[in-house]
C-alpha cells in the first residue's frame, strides 16, 4: 500500500510548526500505524541511500519524526496522534498503536497531528507534554489509608453493579484523547473517570467530595476548558468511558460546594 503522509513538524513548544509531506510505499496492510511510522523513520535516517523508498516532497527538517509510544498494546496510554481529524484515527475503541493500515485505502492522504490543547504543550513534532493529567491525579486521585497488612478481598462486600461501574471507569488509560476531541479541550471525562472509580467503592467514598473539589480546581488551574456537553470525548475514547462519569463528577462537585457528603 502507498500513502501520502502530511506530518506536523515542530522543534519545540515555542517554535512555529508546519506540515511536511512524505510519500511512503510498499506498506503492508497488516502494519500498525506506529509500525508504519517506524518504517518512515528508518527511511528518513537512510534516505540518502540510492535504494531508499521514501520520497520527501518538502522536508527542511531531517531528523526522524518524534512520537510517543511504549507498550503498543493499547494499555499504557502513551501513544496519541490526531489522524485525519480524529484522535487515534478512523476507528472506534482503539488507541493509535492498535490502528492498522488496512483501515485506510491504497493511495490515501493521511494527516497526522499532535494533541491540540493549551494544557498539552508540544515537546517536539507529535510529542506533547501530558503531565497535566498526572498533576490532576496528584491533587486528589487517591485514597488515604493506613499502611499495614493487606485485608482480605472480601472484607468489605461490594455490590456487583457498583464494582462493574468502578471497573469501567478505572479502564481509563489517561491518553488524553478526550481532551484532544473536545472543542474546549476539557478534561472532564478523564477527571470524571478518575473520580468515579474511587467514589463508587466504599474505600473511596470517605473523601469523595473533597477529591472532586480538588481535582476540578486543579484541572481549571492547568488551563483545561469547560465541558459544554457535546460528548465528543465519549465518542473518541479508546476505552469507551461513558459520559455518566461526567454527570457523577458534576454531582459530587456541587455537593462539595454545598458542604454535603457525596451519595
Indicate residue ranges for each PLM-predicted region.
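Eukaryote-biased recognition of intrinsically disordered, low-complexity regulatory segments
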Residues: 1-23
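Short, contiguous acidic and Ser/Thr-rich linear segments
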Residues: 20-32
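Residues in well-ordered beta-strands of folded domains
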Residues: 6-8, 25, 98-100, 111-115
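Ferredoxin-type iron-sulfur electron-transfer modules in oxidoreductases and energy-metabolism complexes
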Residues: 31-51, 55-63, 110-263
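Short, structured protein-protein interaction patches enriched in aromatics and acidic/basic residues
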Residues: 57, 61, 65-78
Amino acid at each position: 500500500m502507498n500513502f501520502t503522509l502530511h506530518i506536523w513538524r515542530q522543534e519545540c513548544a515555542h517554535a512555529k510548526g508546519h506540515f511536511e509531506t512524505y510519500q511512503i510505499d510498499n506498506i503492508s496492510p497488516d502494519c500498525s500505524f506506529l509500525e508504519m511510522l517506524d518504517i518512515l523513520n528508518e527511511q528518513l535516517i537512510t534516505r540518502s541511500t540510492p535504494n531508499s523508498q521514501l520520497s520527501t516532497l518538502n522536508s527542511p527538517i531531517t531528523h526522524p519524526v518524534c512520537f510517543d509510544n511504549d507498550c503498543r498494546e493499547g494499555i499504557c496510554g502513551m501513544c496519541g496522534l490526531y489522524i485525519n481529524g480524529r484522535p487515534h484515527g478512523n476507528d472506534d475503541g482503539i488507541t493509535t498503536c492498535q490502528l492498522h493500515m488496512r483501515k485506510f485505502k491504497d493511495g490515501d492522504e493521511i494527516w497526522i497531528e499532535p494533541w491540540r490543547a493549551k494544557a498539552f504543550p508540544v515537546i517536539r513534532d507529535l510529542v506533547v507534554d501530558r503531565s497535566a493529567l498526572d498533576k490532576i491525579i496528584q491533587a486528589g486521585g487517591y485514597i488515604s489509608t493506613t499502611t499495614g497488612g493487606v485485608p482480605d478481598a472480601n472484607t468489605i462486600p461490594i455490590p456487583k453493579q457498583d464494582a462493574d461501574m468502578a471497573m469501567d471507569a478505572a479502564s481509563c488509560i489517561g491518553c488524553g484523547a478526550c481532551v484532544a476531541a473536545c472543542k474546549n479541550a476539557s478534561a472532564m471525562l478523564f477527571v470524571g473517570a478518575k473520580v468515579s472509580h474511587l467514589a463508587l467503592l466504599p474505600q473511596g467514598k470517605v473523601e469523595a467530595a473533597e477529591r472532586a473539589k480538588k481535582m476540578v480546581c486543579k484541572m481549571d488551574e492547568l488551563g483545561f476548558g469547560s465541558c459544554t456537553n457535546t460528548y465528543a470525548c465519549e465518542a473518541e475514547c479508546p476505552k469507551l468511558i461513558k459520559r455518566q462519569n461526567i454527570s457523577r463528577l458534576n454531582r459530587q462537585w456541587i455537593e462539595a460546594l454545598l458542604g454535603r457528603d457525596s451519595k
